């Protein structure tokens, strides 16, 4: 169970990085 939680957390972090990346690309002023 611990391994699954760790994997979900890493996937969640990568999703956030992807979202932030697209947001920054759409708003270069930031």
Curated annotation (Swiss-Prot):
Q: What is its EC number?
A: 1.-.-.-
Q: Where in the cell is it found?
A: Plastid, Chloroplast thylakoid lumen
- Has UniProt tagged this entry with the keyword Thylakoid? yes
Q: Which domain of life is it from?
A: Eukaryota
Query: What Gene Ontology molecular-function terms does this entry list?
Result: oxidoreductase activity
Ordered alphabetically, the record's keywords are: Chloroplast, Oxidoreductase, Plastid, Thylakoid
**One GO CC annotation, please?**
chloroplast thylakoid lumen
Principal EC category: oxidoreductase
Q: Which family does it belong to?
A: Belongs to the peroxidase family.
What is the protein name stated in its UniProt record?
Thylakoid lumenal 29 kDa protein, chloroplastic
């Amino acid at each position: 169970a611990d391994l699954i939680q760790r994997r979900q957390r890493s996937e969640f972090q990568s999703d956030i990085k992807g979202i932030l990346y697209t947001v920054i690309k759409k708003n270069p002023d930031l």
